[in-house]
Amino acid sequence: MSTAEAEGRVYNVGGQERENMDVVRRILDLTGASPDLVRHVEDRPGHDRRYSVDSSKLSGLGWQPKHSFDSGGLEETVDWYREHRDWWEPIKSGDYKRYYDEQYAARLA
């Protein structure tokens, strides 16, 4: 990628668009977790409906993703989280947990 061409510009970095439930099902499969853990809740006001990133401008400079959804990228991510529990376990308590309890408790009832 030519950095001279890219200087001062904004680029989106992404891969192929996937439905949220496709990602959820794959994570459940990779972790061996039960699909019964999935709970559908009412959307909160302003909740994002989708995440779609167009990286064609960046691809025009020669950038290509190193991983894809189907070629091991998600597996590597799940493995990283398994190996770095000390990084994410603290978010299950304290202010972060209180925030999610406030946002979702009524919708999960």
Language-model features: where?
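C-terminal substrate-binding subdomain of Rossmann-fold SDR/epimerase-dehydratase oxidoreductases
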Residues: M1-A109
